[in-house]
Amino acid sequence: MAITGLTAGGSAEYEVRLDGTRRWPTGGDRPPSLIRTLPPAGPLELAFGSCRVTRPHRPPYTLSVDEHELGTGVDALYALAVRMQAQPADEWPHMLLLLGDQVYADEVSPETAAFIRARRDVSDPPGLEVAGFEEYARLYREAWSQPTLRWLLSTLPTAMIFDDHDVHDDWNTSQAWRARMRRQPWWSDRIAGALETYWIYQHLGNLSAAELESDALLRRVRSAADGGPVLREFALAADCDGGGGRWSFSRDLGRTRLVVLDGREGGSSRRAGARCSTTTSGAGWSSRRAVTSTIS
């Protein structure tokens, strides 16, 4: 849904209704969800981070690994949301940028592990790793459905790009790695499910209203009686050597341009043969001031 005609530097509360019934917000003592527009001048504040393993927000998972073998420490994305709820809106970041490993397909939570066990025999590969579209969709729902995180994502404009664990540890680090994985009988369902759900849960939110309007794949999915086969065909082609899929994107934020590059899947870089580029992602979250630059 594209909303136009908003005033720069403004904010507006909103709610979501389906068939006349309010679906969001769901209640509780959280602040209202807001649509905020960028200020006409001044610096931009961007919160960013990566490498978030989804776990329940309770001990022992919130303990450090030194305190308990199941501990993963404080969920910094959750902490950001809690901090924002205690602040006035003018102290919030203007945007959230997630730089990879938004989900871990190869290191699932106890809840997702139970979901997988109920669906298939985990003694067969890939075991308790995510196997396809349905399990990926479950993974994304779990990652972002906790009420405090839902509020954060409903209020803070967010952009994101994958790294390796969104698909598989060390994804696309070399042509030899790709050849080895393609020999696994479960891999085609895994990579198809990974890119299908990435397109739905991450990529579409990176596009502007104009880009969404002109996106040929989105039109095909919307017009199909069942968009699943259309999306799977695209995902498998995107992963093929030379098939390509454009995942890099940019956003113009006033006088600042944010450019986010795909360092994992860019198909054009494999047309000559070996996959040679890798990326590293740092764990943790921080907030910094974006440098204001003039876009010519």
Task: Identify the meaning behind each predicted range.
Residues M1-S296:
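Metal-dependent phosphoester/phosphodiester hydrolase catalytic core
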